Amino acid sequence: MEAPSENGFYFYVLWCADQTLYTGYTVNLKQRVARHNSGQGAKYTRVPKRRPVQLLYYESFENQHDAMSAEYFFKKQSRKEKLKYLKNNGVIVTTFSH
């Protein structure tokens, strides 16, 4: 995965320390991941057992609507479907499947 630019429209997936997935949308990916890891991110990632988080996957978009639509679609999938989506997009998920 190539490094994201500092600003843009991103849909992203985090791997949490408790082996769960967190999905979000942001305009500054590096800053958002740092906020999740500092405990200042979403309520879900503020739970200490979920940190640290790792950026597992992201997609960049030309506009906010498309990034938010991708996030919405992904969040509605089952865990099994999410892992399949990630695998189909080049993420090695064998270590993340349990």
UniProtKB/Swiss-Prot annotation:
Identification of the protein by name: UPF0213 protein in ldhD 5'region
Record family assignment: Belongs to the UPF0213 family.
Domain GIY-YIG: 7-84
SMART domains given in the database record: GIYc
Organism for this UniProt entry: Pediococcus acidilactici
